[in-house]
Amino acid sequence: DDCLGMFSSCDPNNDKCCPNRVCRVRDQWCKYKLW
């Protein structure tokens, strides 16, 4: 499966961001997971 890179738009209900990235509802793009 391809994962979504940094700043890719994403769906918070179906988070396909790459490892150590997270899809936030507020932003709806993949960003670094800091914790």
UniProtKB/Swiss-Prot annotation:
<keyword id="KW-1220">Voltage-gated potassium channel impairing toxin</keyword>
<dbReference type="InterPro" id="IPR011696">
    <property type="entry name" value="Huwentoxin-1"/>
</dbReference>
<feature type="disulfide bond">
    <location>
        <begin position="3"/>
        <end position="18"/>
    </location>
</feature>
<keyword id="KW-0632">Potassium channel impairing toxin</keyword>
<comment type="similarity">
    <text>Belongs to the neurotoxin 10 (Hwtx-1) family. 59 (Tltx) subfamily.</text>
</comment>
<keyword id="KW-0964">Secreted</keyword>
<keyword id="KW-1015">Disulfide bond</keyword>
<dbReference type="GO" id="GO:0008200">
    <property type="term" value="F:ion channel inhibitor activity"/>
</dbReference>
<keyword id="KW-0800">Toxin</keyword>
<protein>
    <recommendedName>
        <fullName>Kappa-theraphotoxin-Tb1c</fullName>
    </recommendedName>
</protein>
<dbReference type="GO" id="GO:0090729">
    <property type="term" value="F:toxin activity"/>
</dbReference>
<dbReference type="GO" id="GO:0015459">
    <property type="term" value="F:potassium channel regulator activity"/>
</dbReference>
<feature type="disulfide bond">
    <location>
        <begin position="17"/>
        <end position="30"/>
    </location>
</feature>
<feature type="disulfide bond">
    <location>
        <begin position="10"/>
        <end position="23"/>
    </location>
</feature>
<comment type="function">
    <text>Blocks Kv4.2/KCND2 voltage-gated potassium channels probably by shifting the voltage-dependence of channel activation to more depolarized potentials and by binding to the S3-S4 linker region of the voltage sensor domain.</text>
</comment>
<keyword id="KW-0872">Ion channel impairing toxin</keyword>
<keyword id="KW-0528">Neurotoxin</keyword>
<dbReference type="Pfam" id="PF07740">
    <property type="entry name" value="Toxin_12"/>
</dbReference>
<comment type="subunit">
    <text>Monomer.</text>
</comment>
<dbReference type="GO" id="GO:0005576">
    <property type="term" value="C:extracellular region"/>
</dbReference>
<keyword id="KW-0960">Knottin</keyword>
